[in-house]
């Protein structure tokens, strides 16, 4: 049995590209709408392992509200990223247009981590 998360966002094509950039992921399956403008379903993998699925949100939340109030309803944890450089790269990509809740710092359980609500409203905790 395997398990990974799926996010529903507006601008799903752009979001998938950001995830690929931030985490070194690749699109392994994709199903677009008839107009070829959004993902009905898209699966991403990192090093051959399923990482995340995404689809276009039919009823998106108000991202400006999420950012203004730093609203965390759920956080996606990406850990064992391998290096501080990998964490810094993901932080740079995800923080563009987003809200940094915790900049890159150390905690007792992680020597290099950060928390960001990125521009599509999803909260990410990234860690070495």
Predicted features along the sequence, with ranges:
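Vicinal oxygen chelate
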Residues: 1-10, 17-117, 126-128
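Active-site His/Glu-centered metal-binding helix of metallohydrolases
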Residues: 120
